[in-house]
């Protein structure tokens, strides 16, 4: 088995027994793929598919003028190069975007001859900037990294549902159908309690559904024919005879004797059963004599027309009465049809609706619809027809989308999954005269009707045939990712442009305008900017640690535009659904109001072409599990029979047991092995990335696992990352895919390494033609993340190391040797200790603080802005009025703090003065100014100072100056340093290239003769020593005798010169970019950003947690010598409360502790072997015991492929503990942990006798001691501690503000007032309600008194009393206070 560069150095013992069938997919694919499809940047204009930007342009263009004489056509787009790269955009606070240029063709038609083209003008039009995605799936918008979260919304299509009996008091189920398009009006059909069908458009007032059918052009007769079967009645000699369909009689009660061959088959009043029907069928009766009473109450199916006069005798849907029957008889009608209905499965719903329908003609129906959509406007025929057409029948206003059409056709049981984006109706389109209508009619014909099919299905469901849909089913919800949402926004912008363009197009022909004059790109740019800047789904990236980044990008939210809202989402939407299996994690979701609405993608899930989530499964062919992987969506999965991943298998790949636990139709059940069609690919298929990092997840309660998943995302990167001793084996994937590490793009040999960059000389076979073959990786050093934590990369490679593509070469924050490392391994004991671990408190040892185990670095960015004010420009300077020398000691001559200065609260970081208006001077001041020439008093000090409670070191300063404003010395120094760094990179690249070329030339030239040059005589033979002694320039002066060699030498020289030229151009570009002025906001002259690094040690009040939802606050830090210790005198680091385990049911933490104890013990034993300098063979044997013998099952490791040096390096890295991987649902068993404990020389119980460090006495019983992975969470007491004496007040109520951010006070609320009232503490109460709150004069006096040492107070009127008076007056009641 092949190990990567970092895996070789430290192998995790893997307990997994199940075969690893499938590699973990790239974790950020959902973001990157979606946006790549949107931009299609890598394809030429001709190759682009109709999706993303291309689709948006094609849907809006061509734009024709109102007269039809001019049109704008679209001919492809291209992107320019972004001005700044990602890092520069973050520093400068700009958006990382590329300019979009679109080729537009203006076609002008000849007015006289129709269709002839008079003129064509083509031009590239600038359409604004489109933000680009960074390689890690984020966007840089105004200098901050943001993530666009994918949205899980209801798929377009048709859905059938009922109201669960909530609408009507009787609890009757009212069924409804809803057609949801991708864009356009919603169409609802619904039953009311009287069983009539109504239609609503866009949730407006309801109308009888038949109005819509009438508007489409259907007559009453046609409607009845479409929805009902009929009974044929013939009249012979005054006797009514009904054509017998025996099946229709089942379940009815006979109202007359039914005869067959003269015998009574069914007596009057009896219920007709299946036996009776069989008898009737046997008798072969075609017509049944029926009494006239039987027909009364039935309805006519077709209008009856007098053959002679052509008038309608009786309209269809008329109830038959004795009078109507007589009328028919008089008219000489011998046969007619009645509607066949019954109460069971053929309700009279549409017939009832038709009778409630007031309209008679299509025009009346259109007018009725117009009145409902536009109440109060007078309808005209054209307006009504237009409105109706624009609702559902035109591409511009209505689009089901391919997904919607597919779902629509599938739900209605049609064969074909494709079709038009509009709602099609054959009858309506046959009558349309416009071009679009004719095209659709030719394509689709006159048979199909979407609306009728929906109604039919709805009526069928009401009749008891068919079921309603489950809207929480993942087959009915789809994922909208970045690309799709950006496309929609872009289209919105284009539609706005279209409106403006149409107006101007009529001018185009007369005034000779070009496309650029017609198109204003502002609306497009504004729509895109609004989406990326302020959409609900464009979120500030959670950058606490690599895991929180990855999780944020894989998040799926049901909220956002077009989605649900928190308040309206019910319990069902939030709940775990069977279709979530393998698609959405059932564990990871926030606690609080968003629970269940924000989810995380499962590890292996992906979205298919339609946006539905799919999960991979292995196909089972002929009872054997194949290697073929098939992705199934939630709908496809229903009919499959899917075996669990841990089903027992035979050698040949078949199933061992006859009956296997499977999933079928979303239920867990047991089925025969022959029926199985698929099998899961991995045990962690069910859970998300964060949950798959929790070892022994299978032993934790779900609620605690949820907390564990969420709290890992809040872990602060520690100063030195420490890999978890007990992991799940997934840490490596997260670290690699998160993008915080430096991953080799191509293989090669490391040429140079320092703390800030790695240079790799690429393997020859990976170098493409005509490029340098040098990869330079600049590392990120001490940079601020979005959450103010520190991003820092440290190289792992040494000079001369060989790396392969995708190897990790440098660790990022919270990464240790290529593995995610969010916390530290702590030696924990589970025992009570003097009440210091009451209620989940945590007791830690001073050693943890001393060793800086949980010390973290936080970086704050402080910005000072110099603006142009009305009184004059603000100035950044060290010349600040009324400030002593000491305060200026840390500033340079430009007034900006030095890098490396240690500052604390109140120190000046950037000196700034603001001009203030001329003030009237007192005579004394005038005198002083006259004597000393003091000019400084016309400016005031507005310097940027360090805020309260902050103490740290300045690590970086950035200065941005507006174009045209002279740069200060500091800005020039910063620019110089940046250019120097760039120059250094170029030099190194050139040096390696040169060495590489000379090395190849050397191989060719050794032993060859030269015809002089470089001071050599003709015929001199070149040896290795001579060549090694030559400078690079001298090489190219040589004149080899061999023509081939001479040609190679010349080619090499040209190549190097060309490369040098390219480098010079790159340097010039960089120089222009750096030294040019900056594009700052309006009125801003200069911006100085100061970065302050703060070191935070762990302290009481900080929140810590394990990975199992076991969180707590540090109560006290005890001296090392007072902590409980074992027989060797080794104290524990952390003492946890054992009572935190049983009730919380997260036993995983105990198993982790035991396994950690074994891991550490094994490391210590390896350490002893190294210290005793045991033979390498012995170390190999012991390692083999650990990896391949202890804990029988696990994955074997190929230690024989390691050289002796590699074994020693591995052993040295294992001294701190042998890392273990216990994968989710496939982890270590109890007996394996016991075996390892034994191998490590510990007791199998995992418990140890401890002694009290203070008294030296042994505790009464043994204590569970081991190693647990603890995290420090980003809820630090430093950020929460806050105190106020006086400060700012609210404007209206004059009460102190609240919260640390506003430097607010403690609210003494209603209940606290009750408490004081209950104790009768009148004076305290008075003080609280007046001088400490909103008695403006009183509080000023008290403050003055306290300063003077006088502790009296005289309370006055609280301001809130005046507010109350004003409120009463605003009600129109005059109220005045009387003065005593």
Curated annotation (Swiss-Prot):
Assembly mode: The RNAP catalytic core consists of 2 alpha, 1 beta, 1 beta' and 1 omega subunit. When a sigma factor is associated with the core the holoenzyme is formed, which can initiate transcription.
Function: DNA-dependent RNA polymerase catalyzes the transcription of DNA into RNA using the four ribonucleoside triphosphates as substrates.
Reactions it catalyzes: RNA(n) + a ribonucleoside 5'-triphosphate = RNA(n+1) + diphosphate
UniProt keywords, alphabetically: DNA-directed RNA polymerase, Nucleotidyltransferase, Transcription, Transferase
GO BP term, example: DNA-templated transcription
GO molecular function, one term: ribonucleoside binding
CDD domains referenced in this protein's UniProt entry, alphabetically: RNA_pol_B_RPB2
Database matches in InterPro entries: DNA-dir_RNA_pol_bsu_ext_1_sf, DNA-dir_RNA_pol_bsu_external_1, DNA-dir_RNA_pol_su2, DNA-dir_RNAP_su2_dom, DNA-dir_RNAP_su2_hyb_sf, RNA_pol_bsu_bac, RNA_pol_bsu_CS, RNA_pol_bsu_protrusion
Encoding gene (name): rpoB
Organism: Alcanivorax borkumensis (strain ATCC 700651 / DSM 11573 / NCIMB 13689 / SK2)
Pfam family of the protein (one): RNA_pol_Rpb2_45
GO terms for cellular component: DNA-directed RNA polymerase complex
Family note: Belongs to the RNA polymerase beta chain family.
UniProt protein name: DNA-directed RNA polymerase subunit beta
Entry EC number(s): 2.7.7.6
């Amino acid at each position: 088995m092949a190990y990567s560069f970092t895996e070789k150095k430290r192998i995790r013992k893997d307990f997994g027994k199940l075969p690893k069938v499938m590699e973990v997919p790239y974790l950020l694919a959902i973001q990157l793929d979606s946006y790549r499809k949107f931009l299609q940047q890598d394809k030429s204009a001709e190759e682009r598919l109709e999706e993303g930007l291309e689709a948006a342009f094609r849907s809006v263009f061509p734009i024709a003028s109102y007269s039809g004489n001019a049109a704008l056509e679209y001919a492809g787009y291209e992107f320019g190069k972004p001005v700044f790269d990602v890092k520069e955009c973050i520093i400068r606070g700009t958006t990382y975007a590329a300019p979009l240029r679109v080729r537009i063709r203006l076609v002008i038609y000849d007015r006289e001859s129709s269709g002839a083209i008079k003129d064509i003008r083509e031009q590239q039009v600038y359409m604004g900037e489109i933000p680009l995605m960074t390689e890690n799936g984020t966007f840089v918008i105004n200098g901050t990294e943001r993530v666009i979260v994918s949205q899980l919304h209801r798929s377009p299509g048709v859905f059938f549902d009922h109201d669960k009996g909530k609408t009507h008091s009787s609890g009757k189920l009212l069924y409804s159908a809803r057609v949801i398009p991708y864009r356009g009006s919603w169409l609802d059909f619904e039953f009311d309690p009287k069983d009539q069908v109504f239609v609503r458009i866009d949730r407006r007032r309801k109308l009888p559904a038949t109005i819509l059918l009438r508007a489409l052009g259907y007559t009453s007769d046609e409607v009845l024919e479409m929805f009902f079967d009929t009974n044929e009645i013939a009249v012979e000699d005054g006797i009514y005879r009904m054509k017998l369909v025996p099946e229709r009689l089942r379940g009815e009660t006979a109202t007359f004797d039914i005869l067959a061959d003269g015998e009574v088959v069914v007596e009057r009043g009896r219920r007709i059963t299946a036996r009776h029907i069989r008898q009737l069928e046997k008798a072969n009766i075609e017509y049944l004599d029926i009494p006239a009473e039987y027909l009364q109450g039935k309805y006519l199916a077709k209008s009856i027309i007098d053959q002679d006069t052509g008038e309608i005798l009786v309209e269809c849907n008329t109830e038959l009465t004795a009078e109507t029957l007589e009328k028919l008889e008089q008219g000489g009608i011998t046969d007619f049809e009645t509607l066949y209905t019954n109460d069971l499965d053929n309700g009279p719903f549409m017939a009832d609706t038709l009778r409630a329908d007031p309209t008679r003609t299509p025009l009346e129906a259109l007018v009725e619809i117009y009145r409902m959509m536009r109440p109060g406007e007078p309808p005209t025929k054209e307006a009504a027809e237009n409105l109706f057409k624009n609702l559902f029948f035109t591409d511009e206003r209505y689009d089901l989308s391919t997904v919607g059409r597919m779902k629509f056709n599938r739900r209605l049981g049609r064969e074909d999954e494709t079709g038009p984006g509009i709602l099609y109706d054959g009858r309506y389109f046959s009558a349309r005269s416009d071009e679009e209508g004719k095209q659709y009619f030719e394509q689709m014909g006159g048979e199909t009707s979407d609306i009728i099919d929906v109604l039919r299905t709805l009526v069928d469901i009401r009749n008891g045939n068919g079921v309603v849909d489950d809207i929480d089913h993942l087959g009915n919800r789809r994922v909208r990712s970045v690309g799709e949402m950006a496309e929609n926004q872009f289209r919105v912008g284009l539609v706005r442009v279209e409106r403006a363009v149409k107006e101007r197009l009529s001018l185009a022909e007369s005034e000779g305008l070009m496309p650029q004059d017609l198109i204003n790109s502002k609306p497009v740019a504004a729509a895109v900017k609004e989406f990326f800047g302020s959409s609900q789904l464009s979120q500030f990236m959670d950058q606490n640690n690599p895991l929180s980044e990855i999780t944020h990008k894989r998040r799926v939210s049901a909220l956002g535009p077009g989605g649900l809202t928190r308040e309206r989402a019910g319990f069902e939407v939030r709940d775990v659904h069977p279709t979530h299996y393998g698609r959405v994690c059932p564990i990871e979701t926030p606690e609080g109001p968003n629970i269940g609405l924000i989810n995380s993608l499962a590890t292996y899930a992906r979205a298919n072409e339609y946006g539905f989530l799919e999960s991979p499964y292995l196909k089972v062919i002929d009872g054997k599990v194949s290697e073929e992987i098939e992705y199934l969506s939630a709908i496809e999965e229903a009919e499959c029979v899917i075996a669990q991943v841990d089903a027992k298998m035979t050698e040949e790949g078949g199933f061992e047991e006859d009956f296997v636990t499977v999933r079928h139709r979303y239920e867990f059940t047991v089925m025969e092995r022959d029926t199985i069609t698929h099998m899961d690919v991995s045990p962690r298929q069910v859970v998300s990335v964060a949950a798959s990092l929790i070892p022994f997840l299978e032993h934790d309660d779900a609620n605690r696992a949820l907390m564990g998943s969420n709290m890992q995302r809040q872990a602060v990167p520690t100063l030195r990352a420490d890999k978890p001793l007990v992991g799940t084996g997934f840490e490596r994937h997260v670290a690699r895919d998160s993008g915080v590490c430096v991953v080799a793009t191509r293989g090669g040999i490391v040429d140079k390494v320092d703390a800030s960059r790695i240079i790799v000389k690429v393997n020859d076979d990976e170098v493409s033609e005509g490029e340098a073959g040098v990869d330079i990786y600049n590392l990120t050093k001490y940079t601020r993340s979005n959450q103010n934590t520190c991003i820092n990369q440290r190289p792992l490679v040494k000079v001369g190391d060989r790396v392969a593509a995708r190897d990790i070469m440098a660790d990022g924050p919270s990464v240790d040797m290529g593995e995610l490392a969010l916390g530290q391994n702590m030696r924990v004991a589970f025992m009570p200790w003097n009440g210091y671990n009451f209620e989940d408190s945590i007791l830690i040892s001073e050693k943890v603080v001393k060793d800086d185990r949980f010390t973290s670095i936080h970086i704050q960015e402080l910005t000072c802005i110099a603006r142009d004010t009305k009184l004059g420009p603000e100035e950044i300077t060290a010349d600040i009025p009324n400030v002593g020398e000491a305060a200026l000691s840390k500033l340079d001559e430009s007034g900006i703090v030095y890098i490396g200065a240690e500052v604390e609260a109140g120190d000046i970081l950037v000196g700034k003065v603001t001009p203030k208006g001329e003030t009237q001077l007192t005579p004394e001041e005038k005198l002083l100014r006259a004597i000393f020439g003091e000019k400084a008093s016309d400016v005031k000090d507005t310097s940027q100072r360090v805020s309260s409670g902050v103490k740290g070191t300045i690590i970086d300063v950035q200065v941005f100056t507006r174009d045209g404003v002279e740069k200060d010395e500091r800005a020039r120094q910063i620019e110089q340093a940046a250019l120097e760094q760039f120059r250094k990179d170029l030099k190194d690249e050139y040096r390696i290239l040169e060495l590489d070329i000379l090395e190849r030339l050397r191989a060719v030239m050794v032993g060859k003769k030269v015809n002089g040059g470089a001071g050599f005589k003709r015929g001199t033979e070149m040896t290795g020593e001579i060549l090694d002694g030559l400078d690079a320039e001298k090489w190219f002066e040589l004149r080899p005798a061999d023509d081939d060699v001479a040609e190679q030498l010349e080619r090499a020289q040209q190549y190097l010169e060309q490369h040098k030229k390219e480098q010079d151009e790159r340097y010039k570009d960089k120089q222009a970019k750096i030294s040019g002025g900056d594009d700052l906001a309006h009125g801003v002259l200069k911006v100085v950003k100061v970065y302050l690094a703060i070191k935070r040690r762990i302290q009481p009040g900080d929140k810590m947690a394990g990975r199992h939802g076991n969180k707590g606050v540090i109560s006290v830090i005890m001296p090392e010598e007072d902590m409980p210790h074992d027989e060797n005198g080794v104290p524990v680091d952390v003492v946890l409360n054992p009572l935190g385990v049983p009730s919380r049911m997260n036993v995983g933490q105990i198993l982790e502790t035991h396994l950690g104890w074994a891991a550490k013990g094994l490391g210590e034993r390896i350490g002893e072997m190294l210290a005793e300098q045991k033979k390498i063979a012995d170390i190999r044997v012991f390692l083999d015991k650990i990896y391949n013998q202890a804990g029988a099952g696990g994955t074997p490791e190929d230690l024989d492929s390691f050289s002796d040096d590699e074994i020693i390096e591995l052993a040295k890295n294992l001294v701190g503990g042998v890392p273990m991987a216990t994968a989710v649902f496939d982890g270590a068993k109890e007996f394996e942990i016991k075996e390892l404990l034994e191998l490590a020389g510990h007791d199998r119980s995992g418990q140890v006798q401890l002694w009290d460090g203070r008294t030296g006495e042994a505790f009464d019983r043994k204590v569970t001691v081991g190693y647990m992975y603890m995290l420090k969470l980003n809820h630090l007491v430093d950020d929460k501690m806050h105190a106020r004496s006086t400060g700012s007040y609210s404007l209206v109520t004059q009460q102190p503000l609240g919260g640390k951010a506003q430097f607010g006070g403690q609210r003494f609320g209603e209940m606290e007032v009750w408490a004081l009232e209950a104790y009768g503490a009148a004076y305290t109460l008075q003080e609280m309600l007046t001088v400490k709150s909103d008695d403006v004069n009183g509080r000023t006096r008290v403050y003055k008194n306290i300063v003077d040492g006088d502790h009296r107070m005289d309370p006055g009127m609280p301001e809130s009393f005046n507010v109350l008076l004003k409120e009463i007056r605003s009600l129109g009641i005059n109220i005045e206070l009387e003065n005593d």
